[in-house]
From Swiss-Prot:
Family matches, as Pfam families: Lipocalin
Protein name: Fatty acid-binding protein, heart
Tissue-by-tissue expression: Mammary epithelial cells of developing lobuloalveolar structures and heart.
Lineage: Eukaryota, Metazoa, Chordata, Craniata, Vertebrata
GO function term, MF aspect, one: long-chain fatty acid binding
PTM-bearing positions, type N-acetylvaline: 2
Transmembrane helix found in the keyword field: no
Naturally occurring in which organism (per UniProt): Bos taurus
Residues modified as Phosphothreonine: 8, 30
Family the UniProt entry places it in: Belongs to the calycin superfamily. Fatty-acid binding protein (FABP) family.
Entries under Gene3D superfamilies matching the protein: 2.40.128.20
InterPro entries documented for this protein: Calycin (IPR012674), Fatty_acid-bd (IPR000463), ILBP (IPR031259), Lipocln_cytosolic_FA-bd_dom (IPR000566)
Length: 133
């Protein structure tokens, strides 16, 4: 089921990313850079391990995990979090927890595009990615 997400994805649209970053406590300068950055996300599967690489002019990150198994993650904004990723109804649901807080990153396929919905408290951001050839 994760196979539907495999590929190289380029950000083409972003809504409310600044509000989401503000909610997380990301500083002004980093938010300015984050808002201008158009990252590429590469999703790979190797056996039962999923690898998600995010590449941009600002920062490159990589996580690898097994579905349903908690792992330690350092986010692009340098938060140290406990993460778990599950498949739920065709959606890849990634939950990060730290310091009593929680954020979710939900990836789903809609009309051949990868839609990433980021939620922290009342802040909801939608980012749309198109598959690269």
């Amino acid at each position: 089921m994760v196979d539907a997400f495999v590929g190289t994805w380029k950000l083409v649209d972003s809504k409310n990313f600044d509000d989401y970053m503000k909610s997380l406590g990301v500083g002004f300068a980093t938010r300015q850079v984050g808002n201008m950055t158009k990252p590429t996300t590469i999703i790979e599967v190797n056996g039962d391990t999923v690898i998600i690489k995010t590449q941009s002019t600002f920062k490159n990150t990589e996580i690898s995990f097994k579905l349903g198994v908690e792992f330690d993650e350092t986010t692009a904004d340098d938060r140290k979090v406990k993460s778990i990723v599950t498949l739920d109804g065709g959606k890849l649901v990634h939950v990060q927890k730290w310091n009593g807080q929680e954020t979710s990153l939900v990836r789903e396929m809609v009309d051949g595009k990868l839609i990433l919905t980021l939620t922290h408290g009342t802040a909801v951001c939608t980012r749309t990615y198109e598959k690269q050839a």
